[in-house]
A protein has these predicted regions:
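Extracellular pro-sequences of secreted precursors
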Residues: 18-49, 87, 105
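Active-site-proximal beta-strand/loop segments in catalytic clefts of secreted hydrolases
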Residues: 23-27, 83, 94-95, 114, ...
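Solvent-exposed loop/turn segments at secondary-structure junctions
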Residues: 29-31, 87-88, 97-98, 117-119, ...
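Subtilisin-like serine protease catalytic core
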Residues: 35, 154-254, 268-271
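Aromatic- and Gly/Pro-rich amphipathic surface segment
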Residues: 37-75
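Autoinhibitory propeptides
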Residues: 67-148, 154-157
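Short acidic, glycine-rich surface-loop motifs adjacent to enzyme active sites
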Residues: 262-280
Length: 280
């Protein structure tokens, strides 16, 4: 009886196993029409940036055809977690049989399954290097002196190159309390916190206290400023903050969130993407 129970349990577990897959579409039926008015595909800054740099605006810049997505949403057995205009696909999680059937649709080019990564993140002890450098600087960086001088950024700061006019997109696991921490008061008061989005929860609240704080820490190395106490490496830059990482689970879908955030950053005309994340 015990063996029968274990067998039934195993079969049931397999039947309801959640598979990860990319569903690629055949085309973008609205591409020609969309490219007739390319300025509508980007922010004004992004469009002007592409023109200035001679960047080609093409099929990749056109969003995924919405009727294709709506058709998939109407079906059962899986959930759409992310989409990508650059790859013309959606990322789905669900029952394998339900996902495999999609390949028979006229507007689906192919389906690619991914092996789910189950390893959870491990805590690594933080070792702070307090090496003292001989270079003398005029600014009072206080606790950030070592990191600024290690990168030799004091020379840029002395030329007033502190990020002014630049837009940086930070993609990470969360930015709790950036809207209230005193260290980011300068960022907020100068209207340099341009906004953001939590792609993992489909939420505008990228600074929720329930999110992992790694993004807040990363942002602080660049944007935080307290006179005579702390100076980030680019305190006068403007920032978009995007949540793409789920620290508790570490599954492939996070890479799809990352692509979505990169596409959003490109459409907003950011100058730099900072992503202190790694995937294997």
């Amino acid at each position: 009886m015990k063996r029968i129970f274990l067998l039934v349990f195993f079969i049931s577990s397999c039947a309801f196993a959640q598979e990860h897959a990319l569903v690629y579409f055949t085309d973008k039926p609205n591409a020609v029409e969309a490219l007739e008015t390319p300025a509508n595909l980007f922010s004004e800054r992004a469009y002007e940036r592409k023109l200035l740099r001679g960047t080609t605006i093409d099929f990749l810049d056109v969003p995924v055809h919405e009727p294709f997505i709506s058709d998939l949403k109407a079906r059962s057995g899986f959930e759409i977690k992310a989409k990508s205009k650059w790859f013309n696909c959606v990322y789905v999680i669900g029952e394998r049989n339900s996902i495999e059937i999609l390949e028979s649709l006229d507007h689906v080019a192919n389906v690619q399954f991914l092996e789910e990564l189950s390893n959870r993140s491990q805590s690594i002890p933080l070792k702070i290097n307090e090496n003292k450098l001989e270079t003398e600087i005029d600014f009072n960086y206080a606790s950030t002196s070592n990191q600024v001088r290690m990168l030799n950024l004091q020379n840029l700061h002395e030329q007033n190159l502190t990020g002014n006019g630049m837009i940086i997109a930070v993609m990470d696991s969360g930015f709790p309390n950036v809207n209230s921490l005193v260290s980011f008061e300068n960022l907020r008061n100068n209207d340099n916190l341009l906004g953001g989005y939590d792609f993992t929860n489909r939420s505008e609240d990228y600074s929720a206290s329930t999110l992992d704080n790694h993004g807040t820490l990363v942002l602080s190395t660049m944007a935080a400023f307290r006179e005579n106490l702390y100076v980030g490496t680019a305190p006068d830059a403007a920032y978009y903050l995007f949540v793409t990482e789920v620290s508790a689970t570490e599954t492939p879908v996070e890479e799809a969130y990352w692509v979505e955030a990169a596409e959003r950053a490109d459409s907003l005309g950011v100058d730099i993407i900072n992503t202190s994340l790694g995937y294997t």
